[in-house]
Amino acid sequence: MEQRLKKTPTLTLGCATACAKFALIVILFIPALSAGKFRSDRPDGAIPKQIVKIVDVRERQPPKEFVRIYSIVRSYRSDIAESEIWRISDVIFEESAKRAIDPLLVLALIHVESRFQSAAVSPMGARGMMQIMPDTGKFLAETLAREDGFYPAAFRPESLDDPVLNVRLGIYYLQDLHKQFQHLNLALAAYNCGPGEIQNRVENNLQMSDEFATLVLDAYQRFKKTKTPVL
């Protein structure tokens, strides 16, 4: 990237997401409790205080945006462990908020790039869910190391097969490209074929294809129409 990357304020959502997960788990078990499958041994039939506290968690619903992300990821990757779906949804939710990018746009980009396949490798060598080139991934990881103190040990091309790392770097990259080009279509085109190529075409008033951006934005509109599941 030609433009110097700037530091972005960090928004910590890990705790909120963890609470959301716990609330979801509890909600799933509420019907069993209310149906009388939990029975008190006390003479008055009262539910012990510690159980009442757990049941009260029903009032704390997970963020709707997180639930929508989770449902979309799960619809494409029902073949993987539930814990992995949580992990992917979590990083999309947190990093999108941190970088002020609509998570549905991130999901659309992932859909077009890899169909949510974390082990995808393109003929050009781009890897992972957001199809990041190894050299670009290494540069992005080094930049995040300076900003956030984050750096995966012994970065290798295969490091990009980890969906959490891949998504974190991909969202950061998309944010920076949008800052550089100030236009979503151009940022998406640069994500696809490199910022140097797009910068050259902009400076020399050369024609460029909107095909990739159109695919992403079409998927984005479809995801925006997806109804959030009711828990």
Residue ranges, per PLM feature:
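Catalytic glycan-binding domains that act on GlcNAc-containing polysaccharides
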Residues: 54-231
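N-terminal secretory targeting signals
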Residues: 1-86, 221-231
